[in-house]
């Protein structure tokens, strides 16, 4: 299926954020990167803040769809949480571009834009609730989810010192922990 104009604009904005950072993002540059007129971009997004807000909504919706898809095959206690861990670190589930763009947006706008902060808080509230109701102890669910989020953010911000092998071990340990802590 061919992406619609709105999705094309959002993908173009993701790429620009990766290339130049959030601070350099302009609607004019997004229009150029999306191969459409400025008016076409303004039809969907009146301001840069609105674009950023919708980009986070878009990224989180794609991520949640990946988690839900992966969780369908794992009906044991902790299955949704294992899907969350896998989707966070599986390049086929969420692209590195989406992951890095989301982190950049969160870092740049968190605390500055209450609408963006609300999107982030709502998503994390949903994920926390699902993790805590996934059939393993709530404390273990919190540890796994927060460790997953912490490594994702460290990687997205370039602060992770894990080798590829160490990352695999870390993820395997989180997955294993989710299998032995039934509520």
Where do the language-model regions lie?
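N-terminal intrinsically disordered/low-complexity leader segments
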Residues: 1-4, 183
């Amino acid at each position: 299926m061919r992406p619609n104009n709105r999705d094309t604009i959002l993908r173009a904005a993701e790429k620009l954020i990766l290339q130049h950072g959030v601070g350099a993002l302009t609607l004019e540059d997004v229009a150029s990167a999306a191969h459409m007129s400025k008016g076409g971009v303004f039809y969907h997004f009146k301001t840069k803040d609105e674009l950023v807000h919708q980009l986070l909504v878009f990224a989180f919706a794609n991520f949640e769809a990946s988690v839900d898809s992966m969780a369908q095959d794992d009906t044991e206690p902790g299955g949704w949480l294992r899907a969350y861990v896998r989707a966070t670190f599986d390049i086929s589930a969420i692209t590195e571009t989406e992951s890095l763009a989301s982190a950049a947006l969160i870092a740049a706008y968190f605390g500055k834009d209450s609408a963006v902060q609300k999107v982030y808080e709502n998503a994390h509230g949903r994920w926390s609730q699902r993790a805590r109701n996934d059939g393993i102890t709530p404390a273990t669910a919190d540890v796994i989810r927060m460790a997953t989020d912490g490594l994702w953010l460290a990687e997205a911000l370039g602060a992770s010192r894990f080798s590829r092998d160490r990352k695999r071990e870390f993820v395997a340990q989180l997955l294993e922990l989710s299998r032995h802590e039934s509520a």
